[in-house]
Amino acid sequence: MKFTKTEARKRRHFRVRHKVVGTAERPRLNVFKSNTNFYAQIIDDTKGVTLVSASTLKMDLKSKSNIQAAEKVAEELTKKALAANINQVVFDRNGYLYHGKIKAFAQKARENGLKF
């Protein structure tokens, strides 16, 4: 039985979520990409609370779903995270391959000061 791209991503994410857990000391950095926007949030899984979030929904960009948009979201998210005294996170790529937008997002977040 062949899986679609979305089903395969969800299966990968399900497997990874058993291993990746965000705590108060090291919350989980989760990313999601749709056809039109890019979203990222930092989550404390022990409390079930989103600590910081950023997305392209409110940004004024020419294209909200390309690599440059993902880098802008990374800049905004790291700025908010460092202001909230969050330095270390666990990266949850949500089943996506570490390539393209996800890779650009992660590299920009590391450049701006997040450790993962």
Curated annotation (Swiss-Prot):
Pfam family, any one: Ribosomal_L18p
Source species taxonomy: Bacteria, Bacillati, Mycoplasmatota, Mollicutes, Mycoplasmataceae
InterPro entries: Ribosomal_uL18_bac-type, Ribosomal_uL18_bac/euk
Record protein name field: Large ribosomal subunit protein uL18
Coiled-coil annotated spans: none
HAMAP family: Ribosomal_uL18_B
The keyword Cell inner membrane is annotated on this UniProt entry: no
Domain of life according to the entry: Bacteria
Gene3D superfamilies: 3.30.420.100
Family: Belongs to the universal ribosomal protein uL18 family.
Keywords annotated in UniProt: Ribonucleoprotein, Ribosomal protein, RNA-binding, rRNA-binding
Biological role: This is one of the proteins that bind and probably mediate the attachment of the 5S RNA into the large ribosomal subunit, where it forms part of the central protuberance.
A Gene Ontology cellular-component term: cytosolic large ribosomal subunit
Alphabetical list of SUPFAM superfamilies matching this protein: Translational machinery components
Assembly and oligomerization: Part of the 50S ribosomal subunit; part of the 5S rRNA/L5/L18/L25 subcomplex. Contacts the 5S and 23S rRNAs.
A GO BP annotation: translation
Gene that this polypeptide is encoded by: rplR
GO-annotated molecular function: 5S rRNA binding; structural constituent of ribosome
Entry keyword Transport: no
